[in-house]
Regions:
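Hydrophobic alpha-helical scaffolding
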Residues: 68-71, 91, 95, 117-118, ...
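Conserved acidic residues
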Residues: 9, 18, 110, 163, ...
Length: 208
């Protein structure tokens, strides 16, 4: 938790963020952890956290407005590097970057299935923003759902006639584990609609 707070604090101060979008469930957990942290800091010093306005997106659904529809800005978002060897660096991703890459990557209107987290670049860009640009669709679910029931991934691909899906290497290995994915759950699967399946985001093992 402390490591996560340190990353949030660094990014907020580096880019000057004022607002954080989240969900009610996450915000409750975050506030509880902060309360525990304040109690523990009575006996030990703790670094101050930056002030943010937290907006729960659950509460603003259905309240769409046209106020920003005609406002454009070349910067779409800042994508921070992992920071494994130094402080994370905010890389500017422009509207033009996204549109160009989407059209260079996809040759059809995609039907995507993904359990990748939305905060990960492969999940965010490849399975939420690319379909948006190309007029496609995405059927997404939580990585936790995949870990609990990996058959859900393959069954969803089969049911919605998905054309694109991706996973880190461990996801494919996970599906090869008969204890996690019994052969009985593979019956009736039809993955012939897939045009693109990518293994990326971590070292690819040839034996997989």
């Amino acid at each position: 938790f402390e490591g996560g707070l340190a990353k949030i604090t660094f990014v907020v101060r580096d880019c000057g963020a004022k607002i954080a979008l989240t969900t009610r469930g996450f915000l409750r957990s975050y506030q509880l952890l902060l309360a525990k942290r304040r109690i523990s800091s009575l006996w030990q010093s703790a670094p101050a956290l930056p002030k943010l306005e937290w907006v729960t997106t659950d509460d603003v659904r259905g309240q769409a407005t046209n106020a920003f529809r005609n406002r454009t800005h070349p910067t779409l978002f800042l994508q921070y590097t992992s920071g494994s060897t130094s402080d994370p660096k905010g890389v500017i991703v422009t509207q033009e970057n996204l549109v160009h890459n989407a059209h260079a990557t996809l040759t059809h209107i995609p039907v995507c299935v993904s359990w990748l987290p939305q905060y990960h670049d492969m999940g965010l860009i490849g399975y939420y923003l690319f379909p948006l640009v190309m007029g496609g669709s995405v059927h997404g679910f939580s990585p936790l759902n995949f870990l609990k029931r990996p058959a859900l991934w393959l069954q969803t691909i089969s049911n919605v006639r998905s054309t694109i899906t991706s996973s880190p290497n461990f996801g494919f290995e996970y599906c090869l584990n008969e204890e996690k994915l019994p052969e009985s759950e593979l019956e009736g699967l039809d993955l012939s609609s897939l045009q693109f399946m990518m293994n990326a985001a971590e070292p690819v093992r040839a034996e997989t």
